[in-house]
Amino acid sequence: MDQPRNPARARLAQGGLALGMGVRFARTAEIARMMRAAGFDWLFIDLEHGPGTLESTAQISCAALDAGIAPLIRVPHGQFAMATRALDGGGWGIIMPHVDTANEARALVDQLKYPPLGHRSIVGGLPHYGFAGVKASDAAATLNAEMLIVAMVETPTAIADADAIAAVPGIDVVMIGTNDLSLEMGIAGDLSHARIVDAYRAVVAACAKHKKWPGMGGVGDLELIRRYVGMGMRFILGGNDTNILAQASAERARALRGLL
């Protein structure tokens, strides 16, 4: 049996941009194939701010595995049981919000990795293998190697500890939650502010030092994304289903109104 591979990790390992699309209000599996056809590498299935359930997450995740796009799930802060259930349902990784310290990053890895790297419990019949029977030792080793653990840094405290967070074995991506960071800094929505730029520099430097991938979310302006990619960002949340649909629909309506 071929070993399952995480397409988002593969894209990052090749030195490319791993492009993600947020899933907030889509609840059916079609979103996975649509976003793969659009050219994205991973889904940001949002259980922190979206109304999705673990059931809908599993359905989307299984469709994503078949389509060749990586399902990554953001759970509410500290919800490790939800995180491991999302992984058992087909997730290729967990995005944990508000990781402020290296100790929190270590706890995250401990809960999400199988032994000997952590203490996650294993179950048979995993979607990553098409529900086929696989030796537990083989599944644990492969999934430990292929999953992505993403620590979101969204406060000045987290930025100050970015080097220590990036140094934690098992953390793959340190991702700036730009909107929340600007809010915490008292500069809400000013995503090009000098303090935000300095935070990006700090995270990029920490990731380069510890051979991790720097990531970003919450930035919609393409030119600003271009600027941060030029600084070294590689794991890019490109938007979410709600905003993309609303914006495209508004543009279409304006164009049609202009016909008369």
Q: Which residues are covered by each model-predicted region?
A:
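N-terminal amphipathic alpha-helix/helix-capping segment at the start of soluble metabolic enzymes
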Residues: 1-22, 133-145, 201-204, 208-209, ...
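Conserved N-terminal beta1-alpha1 strand-loop-helix module at the mouth
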Residues: 1-78, 110, 149, 168-171
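Conserved beta-strand positions in the central sheet of alpha/beta enzyme cores
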Residues: 20, 43-44, 95-96, 175, ...
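Glycine-rich beta-to-alpha transition loops that act as phosphate-gripper elements at the mouths
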Residues: 23-27, 74-80, 98-100, 152-157, ...
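Glycine-enriched alpha-helix->loop->beta-strand junction motifs that scaffold or abut catalytic
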Residues: 38-42, 88-93, 113-114, 167-173, ...
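Alpha-helix-loop-beta-strand connector modules within alpha/beta enzyme cores
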Residues: 54-88, 112-118, 141-144, 192-215, ...
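C-terminal helical cap(s) of enzyme catalytic domains, especially alpha/beta-barrels
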Residues: 60, 102-118, 243-260
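Conserved anion-binding
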Residues: 81, 93-169, 178-183
